[in-house]
């Protein structure tokens, strides 16, 4: 998995070197070396961008895809849904955390100098702008375009009498029985409103005395949001073939409110939705049983305080004041939306069987290293010949990483499988393989991170299933999330023991592996096998190893390891020039890492960052970041891999860690060095494609604004399409 108007400023030519010069050849890479460290200027206080506003900018880039007429129509609807889901989670976690700090009087400023209260105010203003734009893209662009393709999302007023009669029957039989109108009066307190539920706020009037009363009707979340009409309107023969019409469920309920309140006059009704704090706090050091502690906290999460109130823009002031008072919501937390609330429901429309309105189907290929071998031990034989780098979704996950684990479970010579699981799919073949391994008498160890946000219930369920099958289940280290993506297979080969490993950037999830871009290293290298053995001993036992042979491991080693390599790249650049650092990641926030990149820029090292989401680094500022260039690539696949390259010291690293405080200080993360020249060449090609001047992307300017690139009139290539074509070519 996931924020604004394109009112952006072009970067001044004086502050940005010629892009073709910087990109094209080795001889042009790296500015002239700074003479000495003394030549570096002090770093200014305003060198960081706000991480929360940067995240909103990321979601605005997602919204820009929904507004892109060149994309297939249902893909645009999908991006509208993704935007909405992203924003929900942002409020449940990030905004909730800021509000908690503000309410507790913890006015610790952000790296860019803002108090929690100031950040909340800016977030509210920014969210209102992009939420309005989100609604307008749907109302003014996507919805009419869907109608042109025969997919109509209609209102009750659009229906003819036959359609209304049809829906009357449907409502009476399917919807009315599950509705519970909740009145508010001295005998009925204001009802609890669950987070992310869609509701109707209804004002009714008694016909006898004219007294008005409030009632709340929850739109059921266990039925489709959009009700499909069974038959199209009458018309010429063939005219309506392929036409479908949908009515939002809240419109259907609103039309039949008199049935819910017989004898009452319906004065007004409006849709609303609240978001609640879902940021859990589990006191691990005080709870012996982490599983029970987490389950208690999950039960409490649904009752978290409100952090956002979304309302339809037709809501009256009186109704809004009532909701603010009864829900205890601050006026600054209200987001007013034209049209429909909760467009995450557009996934239902995306799921329509209309392939012409979606991206062409893409079937991942089996990696060439595994394509021609069919014996049960084929992957082990391949890895004995050399390391393999897989790039998902272009290389199939199921015929590489998944098969590696499945073959290990079935191989009688395999003695042990040790695996980390952060987020896995509902019918996970990885989990099944671990269960089969345990049932076959192998030592199977699963480190299940039950604190993976919003996957806690699923992970608890799988942890118990694994335990019942005899798998040794561990929940990680107290106070840390285990986010690394590692698997260790121990195999007897003759009189020797050999270890086979996988270290990746993405989760062991066969479903998301078709949608997320990730890389992974499969290897039988003894030093990596020894490192993973030490790592799993740390995770399952009382070992506290902090240094490794060929890995960087957080929370002790990644930040210092990266900064130390930046300093080595600077030193090498001073000796011979050609300094270049390339980073690809989901987020760049950690101030110490950012400062090290500023120092590299001041020394003349070229720094290129490809970041999907948050970036707190301010590029292109003369004196400290003029040699830093930041771009963001979004597309049909979620760019998820983390890769770092230091040119002069000739090191490539891949792994699970983004450059964020939580990854470097509060998680177990792993970066592995890729050494095989054939594999580093693959990573180099990936960087060259992502950084090509003609690649469609957004570029970050020194003012914090993101600008679409290339500009109109220039050649444009799609990074992901290019990779799909490359993987399919013979």
UniProtKB/Swiss-Prot annotation:
Q: What class of enzyme is it?
A: transferase
Q: Which cofactor does it need?
A: Mg(2+)
Q: Which InterPro entries match?
A: PP_kinase, PP_kinase_C_1, PP_kinase_middle, PP_kinase_middle_dom_sf, PPK_C_dom2, PPK_N_dom, PPK_N_dom_sf
**Active site, renumbered:** 483 (phosphohistidine intermediate)
Region spans: Disordered: 1-39
> Which keywords has UniProt assigned to this entry?
ATP-binding, Kinase, Magnesium, Metal-binding, Nucleotide-binding, Phosphoprotein, Transferase
Q: Which reaction does it catalyse?
A: [phosphate](n) + ATP = [phosphate](n+1) + ADP
Report what the Swiss-Prot or TrEMBL entry states about this protein's PTMs: An intermediate of this reaction is the autophosphorylated ppk in which a phosphate is covalently linked to a histidine residue through a N-P bond.
Q: Which GO terms describe its biological process?
A: polyphosphate biosynthetic process
The entry's function note states:
Catalyzes the reversible transfer of the terminal phosphate of ATP to form a long-chain polyphosphate (polyP).
Q: Which NCBIfam families match?
A: poly_P_kin (TIGR03705), PRK05443.1-1 (NF003917), PRK05443.1-2 (NF003918), PRK05443.2-2 (NF003921), PRK05443.2-3 (NF003922)
Instruction: Identify the PANTHER family for this entry.
Output: POLYPHOSPHATE KINASE
Q: What is this protein called?
A: Polyphosphate kinase
Species for this entry = Mycolicibacterium paratuberculosis (strain ATCC BAA-968 / K-10) (Mycobacterium paratuberculosis)
The organism's taxonomic lineage, starting at the top: Bacteria, Bacillati, Actinomycetota, Actinomycetes, Mycobacteriales
The gene from which this protein is expressed is ppk
């Amino acid at each position: 998995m996931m924020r604004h108007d394109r009112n952006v400023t072009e970067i001044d030519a004086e502050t940005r070197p010629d892009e073709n010069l910087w990109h094209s050849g080795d001889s042009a890479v790296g500015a002239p070396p700074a003479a000495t460290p003394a030549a570096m200027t002090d770093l200014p206080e305003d060198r960081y961008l706000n991480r929360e506003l940067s995240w909103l900018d990321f979601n605005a880039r997602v919204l820009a895809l929904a507004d892109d007429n060149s994309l297939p129509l249902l893909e645009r609807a999908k991006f509208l849904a993704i935007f909405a889901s992203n924003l929900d989670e942002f409020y449940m976690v990030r905004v909730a955390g800021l509000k908690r700090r503000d309410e507790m009087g913890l006015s610790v400023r952000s790296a860019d100098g803002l108090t929690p209260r100031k950040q909340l105010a800016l977030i509210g203003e920014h969210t209102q702008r992009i939420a309005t734009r989100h609604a307008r893209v749907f109302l003014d662009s996507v919805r009419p375009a869907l109608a042109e393709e025969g997919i109509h999302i209609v209102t009750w007023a659009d229906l003819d009498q036959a359609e209304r009669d049809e829906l009357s029957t449907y409502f009476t039989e399917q919807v009315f029985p599950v509705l519970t109108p909740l009145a508010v009066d001295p005998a009925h307190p204001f009802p609890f409103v669950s987070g992310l539920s869609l509701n109707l706020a209804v004002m009714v009037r008694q016909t006898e005395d004219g007294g008005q009363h409030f009632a709340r009707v929850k739109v059921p979340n266990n039925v489709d949001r959009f009700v499909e009409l069974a038959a199209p309107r009458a018309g010429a023969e063939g005219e309506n073939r392929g036409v479908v019409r949908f009515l939002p469920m809240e419109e259907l309920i609103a039309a039949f409110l008199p049935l819910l309140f017989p004898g009452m006059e319906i004065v007004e009704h409006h849709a609303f939705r609240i978001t609640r704090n879902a940021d859990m706090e589990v006191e691990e050091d005080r709870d012996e049983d982490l599983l029970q502690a987490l389950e208690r906290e999950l039960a409490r999460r649904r009752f978290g305080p409100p952090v956002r109130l979304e309302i339809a823009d037709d809501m009256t002031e009186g109704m809004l004041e009532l909701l603010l008072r009864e829900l205890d919501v601050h006026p600054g937390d209200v987001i007013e939306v034209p049209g429909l609330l909760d467009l995450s429901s557009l996934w239902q429309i995306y799921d329509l069987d209309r392939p012409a309105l979606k991206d062409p189907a893409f079937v991942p290929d089996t990696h060439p290293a595994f394509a021609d071998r069919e014996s049960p031990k084929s992957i082990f034989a391949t890895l004995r010949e050399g390391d393999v780098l897989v790039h998902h979704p272009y290389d199939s996950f199921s015929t590489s990483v998944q098969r590696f684990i499945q073959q290990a479970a079935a191989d009688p010579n395999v003695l042990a499988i040790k695996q980390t699981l952060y987020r896995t799919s509902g019918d996970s073949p990885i989990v099944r393989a671990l269960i089969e391994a345990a049932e076959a008498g192998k030592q199977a160890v699963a480190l299940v991170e039950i604190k993976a946000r919003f996957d806690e219930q699923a992970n608890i369920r799988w942890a118990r299933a694994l335990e019942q099958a005899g798998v040794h289940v561990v929940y990680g280290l107290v106070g840390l999330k285990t986010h690394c993506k590692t698997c260790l297979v121990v195999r007897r080969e003759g009189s020797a023991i050999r270890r086979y490993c996988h270290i990746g950037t993405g989760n062991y999830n066969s479903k998301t592996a078709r949608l997320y871009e990730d890389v992974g290293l499969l290897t039988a290298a003894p030093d990596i096998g020894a490192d993973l053995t030490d790592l799993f001993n740390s995770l399952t036992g009382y070992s506290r190893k902090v240094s490794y042979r060929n890995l960087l491991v957080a929370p002790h080693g990644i930040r210092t390891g990266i900064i130390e390599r930046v300093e080595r790249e600077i030193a090498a650049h001073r000796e011979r020039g050609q300094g270049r650092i390339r980073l690809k990641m989901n987020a760049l926030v950690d101030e110490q890492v950012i400062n090290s990149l500023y120092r590299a820029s001041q020394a003349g090292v070229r720094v290129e960052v490809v970041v999907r989401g948050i970036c707190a680094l301010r590029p292109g500022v003369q004196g400290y970041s003029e040699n830093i260039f930041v771009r963001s690539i979004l597309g049909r696949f979620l760019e998820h891999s983390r890769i770092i390259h230091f040119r002069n010291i000739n090191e490539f690293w891949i792994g699970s860690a983004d450059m964020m405080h939580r990854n470097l200080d509060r998680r177990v993360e792993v970066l592995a060095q890729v050494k095989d020249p054939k594999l580093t060449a693959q990573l180099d090609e990936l960087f060259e494609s992502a950084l090509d001047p003609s690649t469609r992307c957004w570029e970050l300017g020194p003012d914090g604004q993101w600008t679409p690139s290339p500009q109109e009139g220039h050649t444009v290539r799609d990074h992901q399409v290019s990779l799909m074509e490359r993987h399919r070519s013979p």
